[in-house]
Amino acid sequence: MEPTPMLRDRDHDDAPPTYEQAMGLCPTTVSTPPPPPPDCSPPPYRPPYCLVSSPSPRHTFDMDMMEMPATMHPTTGAYFDNGWKWTFALLVVAILGIIFLAVVFTVVINRDNSTATGTSSG
């Protein structure tokens, strides 16, 4: 047995928005705030924050580098002279970390196996 379809009452449906309303092209009325009373004092003056706060140290470094002439800047290769040392150090640390994890893993596996079989080392 098929369910009976729900019939819509089209008289109570809202009309869809017009193209202008949907695209935001219809004229909008913007109400301005009422003028303040004549005896009202203006808000206190606050200078912009960019004039009050000091720049962060990184921006200070960037500004200092910009003030240096381009001929005094270090060459690009100077930044990579010690790169091989850092690469080697990172490789050694990674290998030591893998060895450490392997040792911990085998100790945990052996401990679980010894408790499961009922043998105790010692």
Curated annotation (Swiss-Prot):
Late-budding domains (L domains) are short sequence motifs essential for viral particle budding. They recruit proteins of the host ESCRT machinery (Endosomal Sorting Complex Required for Transport) or ESCRT-associated proteins. Contains one L domain: a PPXY motif which is involved in the interaction with Itch, a member of the Nedd4 family. The gene is UL42. InterPro entries: UL42. It is a single-pass membrane protein. Pfam families: UL42 (PF17638). The keyword Methyltransferase does not apply. Residues 1-47 are annotated as: Disordered. The chain crosses the membrane at residues 89-109. GO terms for biological process: symbiont-mediated perturbation of host autophagy; symbiont-mediated suppression of host innate immune response. Keywords: Host cytoplasm, Host membrane, Host-virus interaction, Inhibition of host innate immune response by virus, Membrane, Transmembrane, Transmembrane helix, Viral immunoevasion. It is found in: Host membrane; Host cytoplasm. It comes from the Viruses. Residues 32-47 have a biased composition (Pro residues). Interacts with host ITCH; this interaction induces the ubiquitination and subsequent degradation of ITCH. Interacts with host STING1. Interacts with CGAS. Plays a role in the inhibition of host innate immune response to promote latent infection. Mechanistically, suppresses viral DNA-triggered signaling by impairing DNA binding and oligomerization of CGAS. Also impairs the translocation of host STING1 from the endoplasmic reticulum to perinuclear punctate structures which is an essential step for its activation. Regulates the function of host NEDD4 family ubiquitin E3 ligases through its PPxY motif and thereby prevents the excessive ubiquitination of gB and its degradation by inhibiting these E3 ligases. This is Protein UL42. Belongs to the Cytomegalovirus UL42 protein family. Disruption phenotype: In the absence of functional UL42, a significant amount of gB interacts with host ITCH leading to gB ubiquitination and degradation. GO terms for cellular component: host cell cytoplasm; host cell membrane; membrane. A motif (PPXY motif) lies at residues 16-19, 42-45.
